[in-house]
Every structure is written in structure tokens, then in C-alpha cells.
């Protein structure tokens, strides 16, 4: 398995990683905590952005960033993988369920993400403006063209 994270560059070289995984019979796992909600044409994350939807074996993410700012997270995978994690993942076994309000807020945010590109477009416009103004003020900015801008 090759875990990759799309935090700094939204691509994470996923097409190349997927090709290598296919060649060697490996699984591909992506931590998309910094991409789901605003990366990709429909905000589905780096796998959508890189045109490998349906070809990433395990996607993990958080509900604490673009999906509402609450707590909690998720793992999306085949049923067998999720069941194995439910039985073997100690943090999962010894954690509490999410509060209903957090679940409801996250569902609402997912509905907003699916409803259109207006919020994503505004985010990207704000990120470009921030990057432009901070650079003009003499700050050195790290990272690629991403809504998360390390200063």
C-alpha cells in the first residue's frame, strides 16, 4: 500500500502512483483531509482532480477542515477494508461516536459542496488574492496553487 497525502499539491502524483500500484499489485491510500470539499471540479478531492475516481482503494479525511470545522473523520474503502478497520483499529475501537450535531453539520456541508461551485470559486478567488497580496508584501509562501497557503 502506498499512502499519499494531497496537502501541499492537490495532485499527489496520483496517476503515476496508481499506475505503479497496478503494476505491483499494491493498494493506494490517500489522506484527502486537505482536498475534499474544494479540490476537483465538484469538490470531491484529489482523486477527482487527478481523474482517478474509483481507482483509489482507501480515502481518509477529516470532518474538521472543509467539511464543517467539527471533529471526527472517515475512511472510504471497499466493505472488506472498512470491516477490517472496524475490528482492528484501536483508535476506532476505543473512541466515542460522533455527536449527532456534528454528523448533521457534516451532512449539510456535503450537500453544500454538491450544490454547485459558487463557494469553491469564491474560496479559490480569495486564496489567489491572499497569495498575491502576501507575496507583494514580501512574504515567502510555500506550497503550490492550493487553498491552504503556508506562510
Residue ranges and their predicted role:
Residues 42, 48-84:
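Active-site PLP attachment segment
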Residues 1-25:
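Active-site core of PLP-dependent enzymes with the aminotransferase class I/II
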Residues 121-128, 136-151:
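Conserved PLP-binding catalytic core of the aspartate aminotransferase-like
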Residues 101-121, 132-135:
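Amphipathic alpha-helix from the class-I
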Residues 1, 28-32, 60-61, 94, ...:
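General beta-strand structural signal in soluble alpha/beta enzymes
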Residues 72, 89-98:
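A short glycine-threonine-serine/GTX helix/turn-capping micro-motif
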Residues 3-8, 35-38, 92-93, 150-151:
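Short, small-residue-enriched loops and turns at beta-alpha junctions
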